[in-house]
Every structure is written in structure tokens, then in C-alpha cells.
Amino acid sequence: MSSTATQLATTESTSNWWWDYASMKAPNRDELYYLKFSLLAVAWFLALNLIIHLVAMRKTSIYREMDNKKRTEYRAYIVSPIHAIGAVILSTLAMFFICGDGKTVFNNDECMNTVRYVHIWALLHTCGYFIVDFFFLYFVVKGDSTLDYQTYAHHIIATTTYYQTLYFFDGLCVFGCILLFIEISNPFTCLRWLLYTHGM
């Protein structure tokens, strides 16, 4: 094999590592993995909040003039669509592409009933988002309106449901991942709020 062919083979094998891992059948009830990935997701969303805060403080006077509660809400309207885009991408991959050979969750029972790592990532990515968002809304914003209580309930019920789904570990994991596709409308709602806030 020539050196070019060897380099190409090496590049191909290393470029597909993520896809190979995502499509691998996940082990049943790997609680330590769930904990590690949950902590990683929480750290990611906390870091994202920090980055948005630092950038917004430097780039927009509207954000600088807000009090801490409004800044938290402002960041939530940026973090939320970032989470939603990630959730929709993972959900789409899980529905249509991860099983390979033209198999989808809609035309193949094995694809629908086999929990893969991509399903776990999608669920725990969302749990990490809900945990961080709940923390900021409850402890920083301290909202006490009907909508705030509805949001608290939504976050607690969704997080609990996704962790229970992982505990029971069956087709519900796949179904939970599919349901994340409904996040597709989220960026538009958040964009509307941001445009209104900036007077556009």
C-alpha cells in the first residue's frame, strides 16, 4: 500500500470515529456514563452562559443596562435555540440515518427498538440544558408568575422523564429522542424575543 493510500485509510478510519460511536448499541443502564455525560452537558451549558455574558457585556449596551434577572432571561433566549438546534440534529440523525442501509425508525422495528449512544447523548444533552436553565430561572430570576411555575414544572417533569427513560432503557429512549424534534420551532420563538428586545 502506498503512503497516500495509507494516509487515506487512516483519515477515513479516524474521521468516522464519532459516527461509529454514535451508532453503536449502548449498554443497558450505564449509570456512571449517564452521570459523566450529564455533568459534561451541565458544564457545557454553564460555559455557554458565561461566554454569552462576556460577549454581550462587551458588544451590546442593551445587555449592559439590564439588571441581573433580565440578563439571565436574555442569555436564556440565546442558549435555548442552541440547545434546540443540537437536539433537532441529534433527533434527525437518530430517526433517519443512524441505523444505516436505508433503515429508519419509521420502517424498521430493530432500528426503533435498539438504543444507541446517539439517543443517550440527545436525552442527556437536553437534561443538562434543563438543569442549568432551571437553576438560573429558579435561583437567579426567582420568577413567581404562573408562566414561571409552568416552566419549572416542565423542566422538572421533562428531566425526570428522560432519566426514567434511561433507567428503563428500551424503545422509550429512542422515542424520547424522536420527540426532541419538536424543538425545531424554538429558535424562531427566541429570535422573535431577541429582535423585539433590540428594537428591530
How should these model regions be labeled?
Residues 2-181, 186-189, 193-200:
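Membrane-helix and juxtamembrane interface regions of eukaryotic multi-pass membrane proteins
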